[in-house]
Regions:
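Active-/binding-site microenvironments in catalytic and ligand-binding cores
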Residues: 2-104
Length: 104
């Protein structure tokens, strides 16, 4: 799905204000499903992205970078999807802040 910028930042655009051509971008999928299978708390770091670029080439500005973790395969089992420990803390993969800053 897609969220409008206004959903996250005050005074930003609504979906109807975004031109369709802004939503059609080159795509790269970083597949870390194997790493996630071995580590539920796997976090993509800048080093992971730099290693990917070393093998595949530089990620060009304006490219949409998606993350494949296969976490969605846990659905519809809520317990597996939420993956809570004994203290109720969820454990799931995601992006590290350094990776996001690098991509922006």
């Amino acid at each position: 799905h897609i969220d409008a910028p206004i959903h996250f930042v005050e005074n930003k655009r609504y979906l109807e204000d975004i031109d369709l051509k802004e939503l059609v971008l080159p795509l790269i999928v970083l597949d870390f499903s194997t790493e996630v299978a071995n580590n539920n708390d796997f976090i993509v770091t800048r080093a992971h992205i730099e290693a990917w670029e070393k093998e595949h080439g530089t990620i060009e500005p304006g490219t949409f970078v998606a993350l494949r973790t296969d976490w969605s395969k846990r659905w519809p089992n809520i317990e597996k999807f939420e993956n809570k420990d004994a203290n109720g803390q969820q454990h799931a993969p995601g992006w590290g802040l350094d990776a996001l800053k690098y991509l922006i």
